[in-house]
């Protein structure tokens, strides 16, 4: 009896405690939200506040900023962002050489806010400030007890900041010798290259390797050659020298060095890649027998390695170069069986398909298209349908062509593939699709009347908007389908909120409650104009929080104003997942407010006038920009293409010679410069191709005008979708598909 009473009592206490905690959370959240709900109340009304102090800091007026930050710290204002106030007060003091004051503030932040996102930065900068205050105690610091990441940070910052070359040299040596940091190696190479020659051999080899990895091949070759000549680290130096020669195009020298390295079976460190790169090198020297021999050695010694599918892809390519389809097919079927999901298996299959088609081998072409269809049962299935349709068209197999044409018209949601099919379709086919549309619309209405919204949406998703895709104009079925879809979506809270025109303070109150006030810091920082830190704080919350409309609303504001448009597109690209819309490939069915978030337009003030000047549709420019960079002005590719339209520096420099531009300095991260020069380059491509073929221009933009002219010569411009289908570079083929699909959406969702 006593135990029973005790259990009941404990249970009631637990329930009471939980209820009380929930009430406290709700009340404090509501109170917190109410206190700072409106923008005019969310920040301090005082003339001196975080925003005014931060503006002074950003303008380089560090002493004034320090005074304002410290004044704010002594008031009750902006307590939610007090850690930021302390941090920037410390940073302002550091930049004014007020080292003790900065150290005290960094220490205060670390003591009061151990869980702040600024804590590790405070720890770093406190150590750096102490290093400066104590006049660069290099030996004591690097031999001290600080953690490795602290030493690396302090060393790199001090190396960048000091004007004393002796101190810089000593710091660089510590960073290079202890941690192997590339910036230290590059510093030595650029400022004291003769010092590297006097390094001990172990450090010399480390430095040479770092320089090689950083792209300083010529400098690293000199040091590897020294080590090779002096019989120190000879095996590894031989390998690296071979790679440098190979990358610089000295293939015969590279072959001799690879042979020397591989001839000694005790050389294990780089044998795996040595075999692979040596085989590739001999392949490019057209010594196919030696290349195959080395590839086979690799397969024998490393049968389960990740490079095996690459090698089979190379075998297929080698066989195709000899027009030997039989041998190529043997390798292809082998790799398809052993590595069915590998990207290199797919590359081998597509290479085989293109070669069989060019050789007019119908049987093998159909073998490959069938394999491609099996590889894409759902995702990009219309890509495989397109190959089947166009190859059948080329071979004159009308029945087969029409089969895949109808499959495309009935199932694809890509304007690119549908317009390609429409270019070959007849009126009877289109009429059949319209009959299908009528049936599915009636079924959708029936399910809607029964409140079976899931099934109704499934039927709507089967409707094909052929007239809209072909002309950009909605017919009755399209309008009805989209209206019904909107009615269904309006049952979701996210969609309701978007159309409710709720006030910003109301959205903030709900979001503050949803996140237990965690979002408040990011919102305050945003309203003070501290967009970068607002983004950092907000994105952490976004990643771990269920996406409601209030969260999405503030994400749009903060991500856009902080310049993180790429991140905004990433969270908007499949916006339907936030309100239960599972058909991410069917953007047409969504209401305009959502379609335009999937395909947004940024930088209108630059795009529209420049596009009109060159008589290019703005929609095409937006499509290029979206697929090149996701509207990220600072984007940089692995080959060096930069900015919104991913211009190569040489291309940009050529366009910048026009009297219309001549930017000085040329800055490809500047949106205006990048867009203007990119649109100018598009104008040149349209002019040089002498065709209004958007597919050909997109392909030329990606792969170069020379290849564009070759494709034009091979396939003409009468049907640009035919041209796009037979582009024989994998990356460009997919690039064109994405760009033209985006162009079709932009041209329909926006009317200039």
Enumerate the predicted regions with their spans:
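N-terminal leader/linker segments that initiate helical-solenoid repeat arrays
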Residues: 31-70, 74, 79-85, 178-181, ...
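Short solvent-exposed coil/turn linkers within tandem alpha-helical repeat scaffolds
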Residues: 39-42, 72-82, 109-121, 141-152, ...
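"A position-specific structural signal for the A-helix of alpha-solenoid helical repeats
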Residues: 51, 88, 125, 153-157, ...
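Residue at a conserved register position within TPR or TPR-like alpha-solenoid repeats
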Residues: 56, 93, 130, 159-162, ...
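TPR-repeat structural position
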Residues: 62, 99, 135-136, 165, ...
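Single-residue signature of alpha-solenoid repeat helices
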Residues: 65, 102, 138-139, 168, ...
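Catalytic glycan-binding domains that act on GlcNAc-containing polysaccharides
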Residues: 323, 359, 396-398, 419, ...
């Amino acid at each position: 009896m006593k135990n029973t009473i005790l259990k009941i009592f404990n249970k009631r206490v637990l329930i009471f405690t939980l209820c009380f905690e929930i009430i406290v959370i709700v009340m404090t959240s509501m109170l917190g939200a109410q206190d700072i709900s409106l923008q005019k109340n969310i920040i301090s009304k005082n003339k001196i506040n975080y925003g005014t102090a931060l503006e002074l800091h950003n303008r380089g007026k560090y002493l004034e900023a320090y005074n304002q930050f410290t004044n704010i710290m002594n008031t009750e204002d902006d307590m939610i962002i007090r850690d930021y106030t302390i941090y920037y007060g410390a940073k302002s003091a550091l930049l004014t050489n007020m080292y003790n004051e900065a150290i005290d503030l960094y220490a205060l932040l670390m003591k009061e806010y151990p869980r702040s996102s600024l804590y590790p930065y405070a720890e770093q900068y406190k150590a750096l400030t102490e290093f400066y205050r104590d006049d660069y105690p290099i030996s004591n610091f690097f031999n001290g007890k600080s953690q490795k990441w602290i030493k690396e940070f302090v060393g790199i910052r001090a190396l960048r900041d000091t004007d004393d070359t002796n101190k810089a040299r000593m710091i660089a040596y510590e960073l290079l010798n202890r941690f192997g940091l590339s910036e230290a190696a590059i510093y030595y190479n650029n400022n004291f290259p003769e010092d590297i020659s006097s390094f001990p051999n172990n450090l010399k080899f480390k430095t040479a390797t770092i320089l090689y990895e950083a792209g300083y091949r010529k400098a690293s070759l000199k040091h590897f050659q020294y080590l090779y000549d002096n019989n120190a680290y000879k095996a590894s130096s031989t390998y690296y020298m071979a790679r440098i020669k190979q990358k610089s195009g000295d293939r015969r020298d590279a072959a001799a060095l690879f042979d020397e390295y591989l001839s000694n079976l005790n050389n294990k460190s780089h044998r795996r890649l040595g075999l692979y790169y040596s085989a590739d090198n001999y392949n490019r020297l057209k010594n196919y027998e030696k290349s195959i021999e080395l590839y086979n050695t690799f397969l024998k010694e490393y049968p389960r390695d990740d490079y095996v599918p690459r090698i089979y892809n190379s075998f297929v390519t080698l066989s195709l170069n000899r027009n030997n389809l039989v041998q190529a097919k043997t390798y292809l079927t082998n790799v398809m069986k052993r590595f069915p999901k590998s990207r290199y298996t797919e590359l081998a299959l597509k290479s085989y398909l293109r070669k069989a088609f060019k050789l007019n081998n119908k049987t093998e072409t159909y073998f490959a298209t069938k394999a491609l269809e099996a590889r894409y049962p759902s995702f990009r299935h219309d890509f495989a349908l397109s190959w089947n349709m166009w190859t059948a068209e080329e071979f004159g197999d009308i029945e087969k062509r029409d089969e895949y044409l109808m499959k495309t018209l009935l199932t694809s949601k890509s304007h690119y593939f549908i317009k390609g099919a429409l270019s070959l379709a007849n009126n009877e086919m289109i009429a059949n699709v319209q009959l299908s549309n009528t049936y599915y619309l009636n079924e959708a209405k029936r399910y809607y009347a029964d409140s079976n919204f899931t099934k109704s949406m499934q039927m709507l998703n089967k409707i094909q908007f052929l007239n809209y895709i072909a002309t950009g104009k909605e017919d009755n079925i399209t309008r009805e389908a989209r209206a019904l879809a909107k009615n269904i979506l309006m049952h979701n809270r996210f969609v309701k909120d978007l159309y409710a025109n709720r006030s910003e303070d109301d959205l903030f109150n709900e979001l503050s409650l949803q996140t237990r006030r965690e979002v408040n810091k990011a919102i305050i920082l945003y309203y003070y104009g501290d967009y970068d830190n607002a983004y950092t704080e907000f994105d952490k919350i976004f990643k771990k929080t269920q996406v409601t409309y209030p969260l999405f609303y503030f994400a749009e504001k903060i991500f856009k104003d902080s310049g993180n448009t790429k991140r905004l597109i990433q969270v908007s690209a499949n916006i339907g997942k936030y309100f239960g819309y599972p058909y991410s490939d069917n953007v047409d069915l969504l209401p305009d407010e959502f379609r335009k978030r999937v395909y947004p337009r940024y930088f209108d003030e630059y795009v529209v006038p420049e596009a009109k000047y060159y008589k290019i549709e703005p929609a095409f420019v937006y499509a290029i920009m979206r697929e090149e960079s996701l509207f990220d002005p600072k984007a940089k590719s692995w080959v060096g293409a930069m900015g919104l339209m991913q211009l190569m520096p040489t291309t940009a420099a050529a366009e910048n010679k026009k009297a219309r531009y001549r930017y000085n300095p040329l800055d490809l991260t500047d949106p205006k410069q990048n867009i203007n020069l990119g649109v100018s380059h598009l104008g040149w491509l349209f002019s040089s191709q002498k065709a209004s073929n958007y597919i050909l221009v997109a392909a030329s933009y990606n792969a170069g005008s020379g290849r564009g002219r070759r494709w034009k010569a091979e396939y003409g411009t009468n049907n640009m979708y035919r041209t796009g289908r037979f582009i024989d570079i994998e990356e460009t083929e997919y690039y064109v598909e994405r760009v033209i699909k985006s162009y079709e959406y932009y041209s329909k969702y926006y009317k200039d």
